[in-house]
Amino acid sequence: MASYGMNDVKNGMKILVNNQPAVIIDTEYVKPGKGQAFTRVKYRLIKDGRTQEVTMKSTDSLDAADVVDTDMNFMYSDGEYWHFMDPESFEQVQATKAGMGGAEKWLKGEESCVVTLWNGEPIFVQPPNFVELKITETDPGVRGDTSGGGGKPATLETGAVVRVPLFVNQDEVIRVDTRSGEYSARVK
């Protein structure tokens, strides 16, 4: 199994921590005035999203995780599994709710996603940065009702709820940023 020395560690690298795949979020090299230099590594476990920090000596190493990021198309959900297909090999995989990582609320069908596979099993799904979804339910915007910040909740066709401006009405299509879960624009 491959491993990384502390000089090779960079943000975004996939590592193995207690037999769990993780991605490095932040690294900080510290050289105190007295004593040996060390590196602080902050990482996020891919499966459950927990963030942890560890301090390592310059002679330590981290094991590389054998994970693969693959572009796949979302096909459908049967309630228990979300089904994805590789557009080149037509290979299909099924992701559980835990493997979806909250991405299920942005997918309605045919979206291109980045699926992280570990031992051939999907452990994390990253939806596209922006999706266009139809508003199925929202209150009508009343003119002059801006004391609460000028926004209102809207339920989308996938069941997700986002805050939208008062001028957006029901049955309109909006663009949503999936990274922050916020309204981005109205689609014509």
Curated annotation (Swiss-Prot):
An example Gene Ontology biological process:
peptide biosynthetic process
Cite a single GO MF annotation: translation elongation factor activity
Keyword annotations for this protein? Cytoplasm, Elongation factor, Hydroxylation, Protein biosynthesis
Write down which residues bear the modification named N6-(3,6-diaminohexanoyl)-5-hydroxylysine: 34
Where, per UniProt, does this protein localize? Cytoplasm
Among SMART domains, the record links this protein to:
EFP (SM01185), Elong-fact-P_C (SM00841)
Q: Give me the Gene Ontology terms describing cellular component.
A: cytoplasm
Task: Write down the CDD domains for this protein, in alphabetical order.
Answer: S1_EF-P_repeat_1, S1_EF-P_repeat_2
What InterPro entries would the database entry show?
Elong-fact-P_C (IPR015365), NA-bd_OB-fold (IPR012340), Rib_uL2_dom2 (IPR014722), Transl_elong_fac_P/YeiP (IPR020599), Transl_elong_KOW-like (IPR013185), Transl_elong_P/YeiP_cen (IPR001059), Transl_elong_P/YeiP_CS (IPR013852), Transl_elongation_fac_P (IPR011768)
The answer to keyword Manganese applying to this record is no
Tell me the function of this protein. Involved in peptide bond synthesis. Alleviates ribosome stalling that occurs when 3 or more consecutive Pro residues or the sequence PPG is present in a protein, possibly by augmenting the peptidyl transferase activity of the ribosome. Modification of Lys-34 is required for alleviation.
Family classification? Belongs to the elongation factor P family.
HAMAP family on file:
EF_P
State what protein this is by name: Elongation factor P
Organism of origin is Stenotrophomonas maltophilia (strain K279a)
